[in-house]
Amino acid sequence: GSMAAGGLSFADLLRAEAEQGVGSSHKALINIHLSGGPSHQDTFDLKPDAASEFRGEFAPIQTNVPGLDICEHFPKLAQHGDKFAVVRSIFGNIADHSDHHTQTGFDRKSLSGIGGRPSIGSVAAHLLGSVNGAPPFVGYNGSWPGYLGAVYKPYKPQGGNLKLSGSMTSDRLASRTSLLKDLDGLKRAADNSGQMDALDAYTQQAVDVVTSGRVADALDLNNEDQKIRDKYTKDGESFLRARRLVEAGVRVVGFNWGGWDTHSNNFVTLKRQLPKLDVALASLFEDLHQRGMDQDTTVVVWGEFGR
């Protein structure tokens, strides 16, 4: 949970992970949530043999995998059918736009008495730890640590101060961090909640992020080849940043990609949305494959209601 679970301190957990070689693993997850819940029968699970009032107006096209057909507005993804699987067994039993349900698999009230269920990224951060000083979980969507404790909250980059600047050196930063620990010592003696342990982890994570510069470099798309940026397009920059963050050592990157709540004008909206998703997702699959990251990186694309 927080840093005192099972009698283990955060340092103990990190030490145990190092001994088990957990920290050397480069397995990663890119969790893309299509906020609003895209219509499955108009995207990856078309029903061409159903009656016209059920099947929708889009036609299926064949991918490079025999028997796997997807929407006609996914021509680029159709060339990468061998790089993804369509999972049709997922279902949703909550009739609202609950990102909590998609991120945890449980109702919001589940285990609420002890903090609630943790999201996918928080579980991965707890089990896998960090790599190369990068935060294990970067989340731009609705994610929370639940009963695992505050230390497993997602890291949410905000602002531009992600690198050392001006006269601030690594030594000066270390000195200030040491002073902060001394000042916190008075509070620690009276703390029984684990909050100080969590604060230690936050501080160390912030120091690691600032001193290494890896996360700042990954987030700055000016460091990316312009041809790659053009391939993803402006609409696909979140996908590109996710790939760069994984390369920097982040275990889980989660973000929302909205615009899928199509109660009205479904087909008009999808004709606008689907080509953007086609370009961004196909570019991500292609990139991961070309960079040798495809065997270690899982990409999940989904929305509410089991879609």
Where are these regions (language model features)?
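Ligand-binding pockets and gating/stacking loops
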Residues: 1-307
